[in-house]
Regions:
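Conserved phosphate/anionic-ligand binding catalytic regions in large, soluble enzymes, centered on
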Residues: 37-57, 144-145, 227-239, 382-388, ...
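An N-terminal, well-structured beta->alpha segment
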Residues: 6-104, 196-223, 231, 497
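Short acidic, glycine/serine/threonine-rich loops at helix termini
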Residues: 98-103, 128-132, 150-156, 184-185, ...
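Phosphate-binding and adjacent anionic-ligand microenvironments
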Residues: 283, 288-289, 309, 329-502, ...
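Gly/Ser/Thr-enriched, mixed-charge loops and adjacent short helices
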Residues: 13, 32-41, 152-282
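N-terminal small/polar loop signature for handling phosphorylated ligands or for N-terminal nucleophile
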Residues: 88-151, 239, 244-302
């Protein structure tokens, strides 16, 4: 059966690279062919993300066409006026991204829906911001974000500008399953329903970026920046200029988009070594901080000088700096700040002191957006997750690494104007709220083993961890997350959390404590790993 299916795919596949793969599979080992055609790539709240390869388990044009057909069918059935409001489509510079975007537009047009393509490779935040600005009923961003170079992905937003949450993901997945990937109708590329937008969509986003600034009377400072071979470079420079900030000193060899990411092992600012080049540029130039966007520019990494050396800020530390700045320089009883269960609880203390509503959500910005939409009487002014995702204004309802870079530069400039540094500001936050320490540990496991490991912990939680008593276990079943409190709940207690990753073959452990040495917290995470 797999051989017949592969032959059918070969006849329908429009991409010559994929056709070559299929020919090699058909000429090769039967078991490998069988494995490649066993099942299909499943659509979830994160959309699709997988290696670029032929067959139903990879990212390729037939899978994208099938996915687009299901998505458009769902929108036409559930959103009034969907065909007229249309779908907005963006793409990054990864391999096949433009092809996948154009195929999505052609599928939409074939089913009578207007399709709007962004004019060139652009950051994910530009796509997310323009969904509401243009009144689209949905948005599609073709990107694998900070995944390895072999991957690509397909991220879906609804008309609110927020990523999908259940039950939309299941309904869209069910709609996708109704289509044969080898037999999806596509319109001609010159269809009147397909429109390629001009640069005004970028200009309007950049105009909005100016409103992110909260304290304009701060001194100019030097900032080093890297786009990490992604699509953020040009937009980030324009954003800094429009916001009245000095032009960043860029890492030249990483500034232009390059699908091969030649100078980084993993194009993710969180990964060890990924920011080495921008830190070196910052050090040589005497910059006050080093900034890095991931390849689709929805995340922000930050490094700061401490004495004669530099250190990477943890995602929570960036969140504390941005959060305190926003809370200090905004007003109103209707303000709302949001973070996730696995991020630090310190933002909650900040919100309480400033009299601002606060909520914790499941992991992922889709849930942060969901919280903002549920609190329609509130104004979301800041949100973050510890994985370098930051929302610093009320739109878009997604993380924005470029807007965050602009505001972080302002935070650093204000600190300098007030006679301190970003490290000094963190010290002030610790004095005011307590010295929160956070840590993470990732354990590589295939997805099924990861689920089993968390289930075992759920059914038989430990009584002690490294000699410390487990006083409470909280089970967030919908998020598949377990929270274990050691010593006491809150206060001086230690909070350990465990969950299987939704996008990678690993189980993630998170820790937080107050007034504890980082090495001690890390040893507790290692002890929890041993129990897994």
């Amino acid at each position: 059966m797999s051989r017949e299916e592969a032959q059918k795919w070969l006849e329908a596949e429009p991409d010559e690279d994929m056709r070559l793969q299929l020919r090699e599979l058909l000429a090769g080992d039967e078991a490998q062919l069988e494995g490649r055609f066993r099942g299909r790539l499943m659509f979830g709240t994160a959309g699709l993300r997988a290696p670029i390869m032929a067959g139903p388990l990879g990212m390729n044009r037939l899978v994208v066409r099938q996915t687009a057909a299901g998505l458009v069918d769902y929108l036409l059935r559930t959103v009034q006026g969907a065909s007229e409001s249309g779908v907005l489509i963006g793409f990054d510079a990864r391999r096949k991204s433009h092809d996948f975007a154009v195929d999505t537009a052609r599928v939409a047009a074939a089913r009578g829906m207007k399709a709007m393509l962004l004019p060139t490779v652009l950051p994910t935040p530009v796509l997310a911001w323009n969904i509401t600005a243009l009144g689209a009923c949905a948005g599609v961003m073709v990107t694998a974000s900070h995944n390895p170079r072999e991957d690509n992905g397909y991220k879906v937003y609804l008309g609110s500008g927020a990523q999908i949450v259940p039950p939309h993901d299941v309904a869209i997945s069910d709609a996708i399953a109704l289509f044969d990937p080898t037999d999806v109708e596509v319109a001609a590329i010159d269809s009147l329903l397909i429109q390629t937008l001009d640069d005004s969509c970028v200009e309007n986003y950049l105009q909005w970026i100016q409103s992110v600034r909260l304290c304009r009377s701060v001194p100019a400072i030097k900032v080093a920046y890297t786009a990490m071979h992604g699509v953020g470079g040009a937009t980030a420079l324009r954003a800094f200029e429009g916001a009245g900030l000095s032009e960043p000193i860029v890492v030249v060899e990483q500034q232009q988009p390059d699908a091969m990411f030649p100078t980084v092992v993993f194009p993710n600012p969180e990964e060890p070594g990924a920011m080495d080049r921008v830190i070196e540029v910052a050090r040589i130039s005497g910059a006050a901080l080093a900034l890095a966007n991931d390849p689709d520019a929805d995340r922000l990494g930050v490094a700061i000088p401490v004495g004669a050396s530099w250190r990477l800020l943890r995602g929570d530390e960036i969140g504390w700096l941005l959060g305190e700045h926003v809370l200090r320089h905004t007003q109103g009883d209707d303000r709302l700040v949001v973070t996730t269960l696995v991020s630090s609880s310190l933002l909650g203390k900040m919100a309480a002191l400033h009299g601002v509503a606060y909520e914790e959500t499941f992991t992922g910005f889709k849930w942060i957006a969901d919280a903002a939409l549920r609190h329609s009487d509130k104004r979301l002014v800041f949100a973050y997750e510890q994985a370098l995702g930051y929302l610093v204004a009320d739109r878009p309802l997604d993380k924005d690494g470029i807007a965050a870079a602009v505001l972080m530069t302002e935070v650093a400039a204000l600190a300098i104007a007030e006679g301190t540094t970003l490290q000094g500001r963190l010290n002030q936050i610790a004095e005011q709220y307590g010295r929160h320490v956070t840590g993470e540990l990732s354990v590589k496991m295939n997805p099924s083993d990861g689920l089993l490991a968390v289930d075992r912990l759920r059914s038989s939680p430990p009584v002690t961890i490294a000699g410390r008593v487990v006083v409470k276990v909280e089970d967030f079943k919908e998020a598949n997350l377990l929270r274990l409190w050691l010593d006491e709940v809150g206060g001086a207690g230690v909070r350990l959390q465990v969950r299987p990753s939704g996008t990678e073959p690993k189980v993630k452990l998170y820790g937080e404590a107050v007034d504890m040495e980082p090495d001690t917290l890390q040893s507790l995470l290692s002890a929890l790993e041993a129990i897994l």
